[in-house]
Amino acid sequence: MSILLPNMAEFDTISELEEEEEEEAATSSSSPSSSSSVSGPDDDEEDEEEEEEEEEEEEEEEEEEEEEAPPPPRVVSEEHLRRYAPDPVLVRGAGHITVFGLSNKFDTEFPSVLTGKVAPEEFKTSIGRVNACLKKALPVNVKWLLCGCLCCCCTLGCSLWPVICLNKRTRRSIQKLIEWENNRLYHKLALHWKLTKRKCETSNMMEYVILIEFLPKYPIFRPD
């Protein structure tokens, strides 16, 4: 018994030491949790303040962009501008020969509506070029038309095809000439020439006329 007592005392001291170590570990583990629980609300408040500041900065940037953005330009439709444009001018054929609606001469009289828009000399020069093209092409078309009519019964109408093709080529030549005149002068003066079909004044038949349209002027200096 005298031998066992010292050993039991040793075991008691060892168990006490282990219990003390466990208590120290528990206290050390609880201290960070308490500190974290204490520091948690402070961190949340700081995060909320940062988010509010960022949102305020974004709102200020959006307001600045809205203030700096110019107002959208007001679009004026072309139909609205054409509605208030003057009526187009018709230049009808004045020749004594007409082949498939195309006369051999256009009227060279200067329309009074074009006063102040284009010089009379320029108008007569342009009409003179068109008449020169017709004077060169129409006599050949008339000859082929007469031959086609004479042989129409024998060829079942096929003899009229040459004069139809020649008349189509003459129209294309005049259209190219008018387009050249537009690019040279008339588009700069807000005018547009074109060859188109219209009814005759004395009958229901169709004829080719030169239509002079007034191009709309866009109000670029008009305030919004």
Curated annotation (Swiss-Prot):
Record localization: Cell membrane; Cytoplasmic vesicle
Keyword hit for Metal-binding: no
Posttranslational modification: Palmitoylated.
InterPro entries reported for this sequence: CHIC1/2, Golgin_A_7/ERF4
Domain of life assignment: Eukaryota
Biased composition regions of type Low complexity, renumbered to the chain: 26-40
Residue span of region Disordered: 1-80
GO cellular component: a single term: plasma membrane
Coiled coil: 42-70
Alphabetic keyword roster: Cell membrane, Coiled coil, Cytoplasmic vesicle, Lipoprotein, Membrane, Palmitate
Acidic residues bias spans: 13-25, 41-69
Summary of the tissues where the protein is detected: Equally expressed in various parts of the brain.
Pfam short name (any one): Erf4
Family matches, as PANTHER family: CYSTEINE-RICH HYDROPHOBIC DOMAIN PROTEIN BRAIN X-LINKED PROTEIN, CYSTEINE-RICH HYDROPHOBIC DOMAIN-CONTAINING PROTEIN 1
Protein family per UniProt: Belongs to the CHIC family.
Protein name: Cysteine-rich hydrophobic domain-containing protein 1
Underlying gene: CHIC1
